[in-house]
């Protein structure tokens, strides 16, 4: 199964369980596949201007060392659950954020989770 198909299959599974796609991380190779898939005749004729504007399921795709997706959903007590899921294998990291937790603190935790996933992906 190609990587974009893996992304779609994983996304379908998470949506079934009430998760919302929040962020998309793609390797250069996967971004290129997405670019080819979404290109129109007009955009094929243009000079490549990077990955600005590339979207997967209406979510901006960011270049990364990982092929992964961030999912989120509401949880009890006003909390919010976030999960980072690798696209190609059944590996995910989960974090529950309190309602009053600062966005800066949440972002720090998400960066740490991405670093852990990169380590897993390399090993």
Features from the language model and the residues they span:
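Detector for the mature cores of small, proteolytically processed
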Residues: 34-123
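Structural motif
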Residues: 25-29
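Exposed alpha-helical structural elements
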Residues: 6-9, 30-33, 108
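A generic structural signal for short, solvent-exposed coil/turn residues
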Residues: 16-18, 48
């Amino acid at each position: 199964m190609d990587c974009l198909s893996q992304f779609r299959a994983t996304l379908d599974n998470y949506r079934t369980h009430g998760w919302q796609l929040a962020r998309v991380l793609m390797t250069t190779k996967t971004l290129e596949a997405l670019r080819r898939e979404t290109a129109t005749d007009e955009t094929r004729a243009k000079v490549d201007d990077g990955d600005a504007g590339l979207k997967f399921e209406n979510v901006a795709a960011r270049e990364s060392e990982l092929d992964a997706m961030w999912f989120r959903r509401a949880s009890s007590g006003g909390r919010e659950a976030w999960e980072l899921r690798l696209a190609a294998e059944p590996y995910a990291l989960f974090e529950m954020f309190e309602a009053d937790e600062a966005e800066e603190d949440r972002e720090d935790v998400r960066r740490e989770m991405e670093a852990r996933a990169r380590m897993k992906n390399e090993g």
